Amino acid sequence: MAKMVDALQPHCDEEIVAAMTCNHAGSMSSFLISKLMGSVGAGTKSSRLPNPVFIAVGSRSIYAFDYAPRGFKFKIKKEVARWPKDEVSVVAEKTNMMTTFVLTTGSGESYPLEVPTMMGGKELVDVFLNALDASQD
């Protein structure tokens, strides 16, 4: 997670305590299905956030960034959203392979996102969810 925090810190006006690259909920399974079945259902967009999106958590705000992966590094393109942390609720549900969570803002917008937890990612996701103050099922 340190590389993710380091990539985002220069773009935020407060200390970032956690960061994670996330996908729109369902997009990872949709990607696998599209590879098996062709482009059926490709191109659907369910959010104003880019997919994938980089989410950063500070003590006062939650940030969303558009980014491009560059090998094991990240090229941050631009900030696409910022919400006061105390106005965002997060509910998470974990499975063995995936954690799905929904960010709901004070204005009522909801952003269902997902992060893989396989291959040792569970501990990093737990740190991220704790920083978000997520309630977990």
Predicted segments, located by residue:
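Phosphoinositide-binding peripheral membrane targeting modules
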Residues: 35-98, 105-109
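Short, surface-exposed beta-strand/loop "edge" segments at domain boundaries and coil↔beta transitions
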Residues: 26-29, 63-64, 109-113
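Lipid interaction determinants
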Residues: 13, 21-23, 100-103, 132
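Canonical phosphoinositide-binding patch of PH/PH-like domains
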Residues: 107-126
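A short local loop/turn or secondary-structure capping micro-motif enriched for an aromatic residue
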Residues: 26-27, 71-74, 119-123
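Anionic N-terminal interaction surfaces
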Residues: 1-55
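A membrane-cytosol interface segment of integral membrane proteins
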Residues: 128-137
